[in-house]
Amino acid sequence: CLCLVSALTGCYSEDKAWSAKRGDDTAAIGVYIYYLSSAYSEALGKVEDASKPVFDQEIDGKDGTQWIKDRAKESIQLMYYVDQRFEDLGLSLSDDDQSQISSLTSNVWSYSSSQMNQYGIAKTSLEKAYSEFIVKYQKVFQAMYGKGGEKEVSDDDIRTFYEDTYTDFEYFTCSYTKTDEDGKSQDMTDDEKAKAKTEFEAYATKVQDGDLTMKKAAEEYQKSIDSDTSTYQSQTVDLETNGSYYPDEFVEKLKSMKEGEVAYVDLPDSNKFYVIQKNSISKKCDEVLADDSQRLNVIATMKNEENSNDMEEAAKKLDDITFNDSAINSYDPKMFYKDSDLVSSESSSTASE
């Protein structure tokens, strides 16, 4: 019987079941494997030559393999540091927090369980390394940078950042094409374009004069062409970082407009007519400051990099974590490698230009 038990359990060892310990907490080996996988994915975006395996290159002056291993251990340090800050700040997980943790875990597990099981990452390890970490990290951030926190960001600072960074606008469009009775797309005739141009110029005038809102004008246009799809959009965007999602002429026009101004714009390169309204960014900021969730999102944009750097540096100073080096060293990052991870040399050189 002892021989049978030994044979059945020969591949399992309590000594290899855990990756790190701190105080009364023990992180399963799956936590380390998860972070090793994440570090490998991060490394793919850091190497100079994406057409070659990361293991054959250096990252930040380190051998690629060693960088990945070190990064995984640093992630465990950060996980424990977040736990420490969470405790120091007197925070706790509410029922809603627990539900969010369960939801995050289930969502990821639903599409990646097969791969994670293959690597040896249990669902409980995913929950600890990913879901619980995210929720605790966010609560620590909010406690530090939110109202009453030790690094509280004032409304004045938020307003200065927000109004200097974002542009609030609305628009709706008319394509140069139309749909025939068979559902096929056809180009407008010159006469049809001229008619659409006149209509859109009229909409711009009505909105500017206060006779219509942008949304109402878009609804009237949608009804006039018997369409089930609205082209109306209301957005607040950092045009310096996300302007590439819009036609260049659109961005240029928007930047040149005054707040409250409404304009008809013909963009032949986009094959569309536009009606655009540039709104008051100050009024939009008032809405943000009055909503705790939106306010925190802006603070995250302002302070996320600073907070991330501070947390990682502080985490490296933790000296009471015990790593199970014999277990950790038995996992090679090459286990995650796939041929599809490599980018062709032509694509790589094009992306770097």
List each language-model region with its residue ranges:
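C-terminal motif of bacterial Sec signal peptides marking the signal peptidase cleavage site
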Residues: 6-10
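N-terminal targeting/tethering segments
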Residues: 13-123
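Peptidyl-prolyl cis-trans isomerase
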Residues: 198-248
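Second-shell loop/turn segments in exported
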Residues: 17-23, 62-73, 82-92, 122-127, ...
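PPIase-associated folding chaperone regions across multiple families
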Residues: 13-15, 118-195, 245-353
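Solvent-exposed, polar/charged alpha-helical surfaces in well-ordered, non-transmembrane soluble domains
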Residues: 30, 34, 70, 74, ...
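Sec-dependent N-terminal signal peptides
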Residues: 1-3
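Sec/Tat-exported extracytoplasmic proteins
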Residues: 36, 43, 76, 80, ...
